[in-house]
Amino acid sequence: MAGNDCAIIDVGGQDTKVILVEQGMIQDFLMNDKCSAGTGKFLEIMANRLGVTIEELFELASQGNAVSISSLCTVFAESEVISMIGEGRSREDIAAGVVHSVAEKVAQLARRKQLPGTVILTGGLSECPYFAEILSEKLECNVSAMRDGRYAGALGAALLAREKTK
């Protein structure tokens, strides 16, 4: 996947994980599962509020100038988005603000550890190149999205099962 030393950032619908790998072995693991603000679920809720799909949210975001979404709680952030819509802010700017907000939340978790030179993005958001781009900016390093990254956990489990049955 990424050689012997890397950080894997897995952003799924329910949680976000940062996994540090040294010499091919997991050395450290962080997870945010207490709040949906840094997950795909947050993006799904905000996309619904804007009346678009997640794919359309990223398309809009790539065309906008990010507005600040200050709330860390999904419910309060949703209220902020509703207010911005009412104020006539563009969907592009709101979408960009939403994506930047999630990327910052993920970056805050990742910054709790010293990241090696190679950072791999897995989970459902690995299929969104714009998210990897924004996360790269937030972390000030290159974040590469894994091909078929949404299946990384399942692929790893299958490889482990195959190894155990040999």
Model-derived features: positions:
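Glycine-rich phosphate-binding loop plus the immediately following alpha-helix
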Residues: 5, 23-69, 159
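Glycine-rich phosphate-binding loops at beta-strand->alpha-helix junctions
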Residues: 110-138, 149-153
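Active-site nucleophile and cofactor-binding loops and adjacent substrate-binding regions
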Residues: 9-13, 31-38, 97-99, 125, ...
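Gly/Thr-rich phosphate-binding beta-strand-loop-beta motif of the actin/hexokinase/Hsp70
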Residues: 5-24
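Adenine-nucleotide phosphate-binding core of ATP-dependent small-molecule kinases
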Residues: 77-111, 150
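Glycine-rich phosphate-binding/hydrolytic loop that grips phosphoryl groups
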Residues: 1-2, 40-44, 146-166
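Short, surface-exposed connector motifs at secondary-structure boundaries
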Residues: 2, 25, 90, 112-118, ...
